[in-house]
């Protein structure tokens, strides 16, 4: 683990305990006891940012905190569990000009967030606060984290200090875990990474005889492993090595040195006994309490005023709050709601709205040895238990009838929820079980306090937009796993297809306005639009939107005809996927076409099904609770009990997805836009390129199309001239505006961009 050390972390927590006790601060319930503002800085002409730290404590015996894994093993001398969380506030300098709405943003892997200009134009307040306590990569804890006074150079990231679990007798907690090395070449040692950040756990011993290192030639999307062999304990070391310090290198618990070096065509997996698990579930409570403090408290226990408090100290300038998280952070919010954290220990509702963005699962956080940086690669948790909002009995996995909103519904603390996502979340991030469950036999209704918007034919988070006949921006498979070994400059090889440009930006702009109106004024947003088995919207247990809290003074328009909203098997025939698109391997995206094995070209390619990344039902052992994603996993690697059926949206004759919310570039296309791509190098060569989408442009002319045997109509055949294309864009713009998924100012912008483009000029 990155510096500072575990011992230093424990010392910092001890400092907090001593400071609170010496000051005689009350400790009746979980709360923020102290805040320190480290820095103020201007943000434009009328806003400012405040960076600081919040010191908090939790009652481990309170029922709302008891669900935190190992919380009893993280107690300090006063019987409480303590944490330190960084934060940033963005607010009007003149707080009386604030709108009353607080956006509480969840950082992604420590990345600090500042509300955008559109939100500042409304007078909104922004809060970014820490939740991820693994002290790794972007969440590394600074050396001055526990300073009782302002620090000169505060961190630019968000980090959280959480306790290390200790056995009741004070001894070290240990357990078996797993780590992987992928796409590493040469004799230099390999760091153990999760996504692209260091593994947050260290081995209990550097004796390699106490661990098992294996290599493998291949693993399929279904988790089938081939060509596996065990590497002798004398042939590797827990060490850092390079040309100057060859094998066995210098002892280092964070890296593996392999005698003879690493083969980039192999994947390496180590199972070992780790020590000092972090009580990472504290992150749920810390994020809850920091947000609620700034929403409601006048001052901390030491008299430091809440910077959002009213001048007369009669409360704060915050009337409403919306929790928001993107990707990993959106997964955090789904887990946050599922485990009942949208109420504090006094049973008060924390957030009025929750917006998980491009997030289709619950975060892997609240179990021992959790790795929250994971992105659902093989043997990574996150798809266990209910991924759906309403109750559903998971008969396929033998789990009880549950839903994400169970706990908040029982206590009357459920927020309004909007979620949106696109095609990449279907093809790589295992989203479809949220819609149809694990048996894929029926559409799971969504409660009336939830809106779901599917942005079709888009990559993870959307592309860069614009109207370009031949996009050239490369798509790179993310993390350390998929793209292949980096070159001498550290660059990952690009994927087969250029980056999918279809944006989320304009759709998100509209959703933002609708969510504010829903939370602040009770005005209903557009009805949900997403693919279903029946091709129909399924909202509420009885489909009755009239029970929704709020007023609907506009026409709720589905936007896209219902006939397009179908989910089908991920086969070319069922999807209606066109054959013969230039540059695409045959059978993709139904199957991967494997052209090499162990770096050696195959005389005859292998067709491997599926290409999509399915949900794998793992056996994590008897101490793991799959419904809550809590407990202690003991099986490493976990056996795959079964592969869960996966469905995908249908596509049109160009391969673009049908249905979903109207998106201008999808509806006035310049190519085929996919939520998937193909890896071209490294261990996962020829397989799905993680969560990165691609594009295959249309030919410009009919002659060029025929010469390339392209079954798709050319731009010339579709639109005729540049003016014809601008007319098609204007029609798509009008459709999106009518459906309330495009703001008027963005409509004009898109028209102007299309008019100024070089399309068919």
Question: Over which residues does each language-model region extend?
Answer:
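Bacterial N-terminal signal peptides
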Residues: 12-23
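C-terminal His-loop and adjacent cap/lid subdomain of alpha/beta-hydrolase
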Residues: 30-761
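Long, compositionally biased, charged low-complexity segments
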Residues: 9-13, 705
């Amino acid at each position: 683990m990155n510096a500072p050390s575990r011992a230093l972390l424990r010392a910092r927590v001890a400092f907090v305990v001593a400071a609170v006790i010496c000051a005689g601060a009350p400790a009746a319930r979980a709360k923020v006891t102290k805040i320190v503002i480290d820095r103020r800085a201007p943000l434009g002409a009328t806003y400012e940012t405040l960076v600081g730290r919040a010191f908090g404590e939790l009652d481990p015996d309170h029922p709302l905190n008891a669900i935190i894994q190992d919380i009893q093993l993280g107690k300090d001398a006063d019987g409480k569990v303590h944490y330190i969380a960084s934060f940033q506030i963005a607010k009007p300098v003149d707080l009386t000009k604030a709108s009353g709405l607080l956006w509480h943003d969840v950082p992604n892997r420590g990345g600090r967030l500042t509300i955008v200009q559109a939100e500042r134009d409304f007078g909104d307040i922004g809060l970014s606060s820490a939740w991820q306590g693994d002290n790794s990569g972007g969440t590394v804890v600074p050396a001055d984290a526990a300073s009782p006074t302002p620090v000169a150079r505060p961190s630019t990231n968000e980090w959280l200090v959480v306790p290390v679990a200790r056995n009741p007798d004070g001894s070290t907690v240990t357990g078996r875990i797993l780590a992987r090395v992928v796409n590493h070449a040469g004799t230099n040692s390999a760091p153990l990474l999760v996504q692209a950040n260091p593994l947050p756990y260290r081995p209990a011993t550097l004796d390699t005889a106490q661990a098992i290192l294996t290599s493998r030639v291949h693993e399929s999307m279904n988790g089938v492993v081939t060509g596996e062999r065990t590497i002798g304990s004398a042939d590797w070391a827990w060490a850092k090595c390079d040309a100057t310090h060859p094998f066995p290198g210098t002892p280092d618990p964070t890296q593996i040195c392999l005698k003879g070096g690493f083969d980039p065509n192999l994947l390496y997996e180590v199972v070992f006994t780790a020590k000092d698990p972090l009580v990472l579930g504290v992150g749920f409570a810390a994020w809850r309490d920091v947000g609620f403090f700034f929403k409601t408290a006048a001052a901390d226990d030491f008299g430091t005023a809440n910077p959002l408090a009213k001048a007369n100290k009669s409360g704060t300038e915050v009337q409403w709050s919306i929790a928001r998280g993107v990707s990993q952070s959106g997964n955090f919010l789904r887990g946050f709601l599922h485990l009942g954290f949208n109420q504090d220990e006094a049973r008060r509702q924390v957030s009025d709205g929750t917006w998980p963005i491009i997030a289709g699962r619950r975060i892997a956080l609240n179990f021992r040895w959790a790795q929250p940086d994971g992105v659902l690669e093989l043997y990574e948790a996150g798809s266990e238990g209910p991924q759906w909002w309403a109750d559903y009995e998971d008969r396929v996995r033998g789990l009880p009838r549950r839903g994400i909103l169970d706990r908040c519904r029982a206590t009357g603390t459920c927020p309004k929820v909007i979620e949106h996502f696109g095609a990449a979340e279907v093809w790589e991030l295992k989203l479809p079980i949220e819609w149809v469950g694990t048996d894929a036999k029926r559409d799971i209704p969504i409660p009336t306090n939830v809106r779901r918007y599917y942005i079709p034919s888009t990559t993870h988070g959307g592309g860069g937009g614009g109207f370009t006949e031949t996009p050239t921006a490369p798509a790179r498979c993310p993390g350390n796993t998929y793209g292949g070994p980096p070159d001498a400059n550290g660059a990952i090889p690009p994927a087969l297809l250029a980056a999918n440009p279809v944006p989320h930006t304009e759709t998100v702009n509209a959703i933002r306005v609708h969510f504010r109106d829903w939370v602040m004024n009770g005005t209903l947003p557009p009805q949900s639009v997403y693919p279903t088995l029946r091709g129909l919207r399924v909202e509420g247990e009885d489909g009755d939107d009239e029970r929704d809290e709020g007023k609907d003074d506009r026409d709720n328009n589905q936007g896209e005809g219902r006939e397009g909203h179908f989910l089908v098997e991920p086969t070319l025939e069922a999807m209606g996927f066109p054959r013969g698109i230039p540059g695409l391997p045959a059978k993709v995206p139904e199957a991967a076409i494997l052209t090499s094995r162990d770096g050696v070209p195959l005389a005859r390619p292998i067709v491997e099904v599926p290409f999509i990344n399915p949900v794998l039902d793992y056996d994590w052992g008897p101490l793991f609770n799959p419904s809550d994603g809590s407990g202690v996993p003991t099986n490493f690697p976990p056996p795959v009990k079964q592969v869960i059926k996966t469905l995908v949206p249908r596509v049109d004759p160009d391969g673009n997805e049908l249905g979903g919310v109207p998106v201008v570039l999808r509806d006035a296309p310049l190519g085929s836009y996919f939520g998937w791509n193909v890896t071209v190098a490294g261990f996962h060569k020829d397989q799905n390129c993680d969560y990165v989408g691609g594009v295959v442009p249309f030919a410009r002319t009919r002659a060029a199309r025929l010469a390339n045997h392209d079954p798709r109509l050319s731009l010339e055949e579709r639109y005729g001239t540049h003016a014809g294309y601008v007319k098609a864009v204007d029609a798509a713009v009008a459709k999106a505006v009518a459906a309330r998924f495009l703001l008027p100012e963005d409509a004009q912008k898109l028209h102007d961009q299309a008019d100024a483009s070089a399309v068919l000029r």
